[in-house]
C-alpha cells in the first residue's frame, strides 16, 4: 500500500552556483534555481484515477511544436503549452485547481527538500572513475595494467560473466536525487530559490523540487 504524504513540488532550471553571506557572516555556497511560473495542468483523484497527484507544467515551448492531443490537454487546462510536465504524488491534490499557478514561495527558507535532476554526462569511463576501483600496483611486476579492472569472473564454472559485474562504460546522464537540501533563501520578485550546496545536473538543466521524503526536521512526526 502506498503511503501518501503532503508533498509540494516545483520545476525549475539550474542556473549555477555562487556564494552568499548568512546572518552569522559566514560564506554559504548555494545553487541558484530559477523556478519561474509553474502551472497545474491536471489534478488526479482517487475517484477518477485511483490515487492523488497533480501534474505540473513548466517552461515555454512554441505551440507549433506540440501534438494535437497535447494542445487539447493544455487547452483544457486553460494554459499555454509547456515544455516539461511532471506528476507529483501528494495527499493535498484536492487543494489544487487546474490552471493554478505555483510560484517560488511554495517553499520557504529553512525548509528541507529533495532535488531531482539528470547528472552530467561523462562519456565512456573506466572502472576507476566510474566505480572507484583502486587499480593495480604502480610497480612490483605490474606491466601496463595499472588502471585495468582485473578479473571479471571464474573459469569453466560457471563459464560466463554474471550480470551486474561492474565494468567500464558510459558514465553519467542518470536521474539523481539529492535528499534533504536546505532552502537558504527565496526571491519571489526574481523567481529564484537558493539551495545550500550542490544539486545534480549541468547549468541550464531541469530540476524537480519536492518536499523532503526523509526530512530530519520532521523525523518522528506525521507528514
From Swiss-Prot:
What PROSITE patterns does its record include? RIBOSOMAL_L3
Report one GO cellular component: cytosolic large ribosomal subunit
Q: Name one GO biological process term.
A: translation
Keywords per UniProt = Ribonucleoprotein, Ribosomal protein, RNA-binding, rRNA-binding
Q: Name one GO molecular function term.
A: structural constituent of ribosome
Indicate whether NAD appears among the record's keywords.
no
Please indicate if the UniProt record lists RNA-binding as a keyword: yes
Query: Which organism is this entry from?
Result: Nocardioides sp. (strain ATCC BAA-499 / JS614)
Query: What does this chain do?
Result: One of the primary rRNA binding proteins, it binds directly near the 3'-end of the 23S rRNA, where it nucleates assembly of the 50S subunit.
Pfam families reported in the protein's UniProt record: Ribosomal_L3
Quaternary organization = Part of the 50S ribosomal subunit. Forms a cluster with proteins L14 and L19.
Q: Which family does it belong to?
A: Belongs to the universal ribosomal protein uL3 family.
Checking InterPro entries in the record gives: Ribosomal_uL3, Ribosomal_uL3_bac/org-type, Ribosomal_uL3_CS, Transl_B-barrel_sf
Q: What is this protein called?
A: Large ribosomal subunit protein uL3
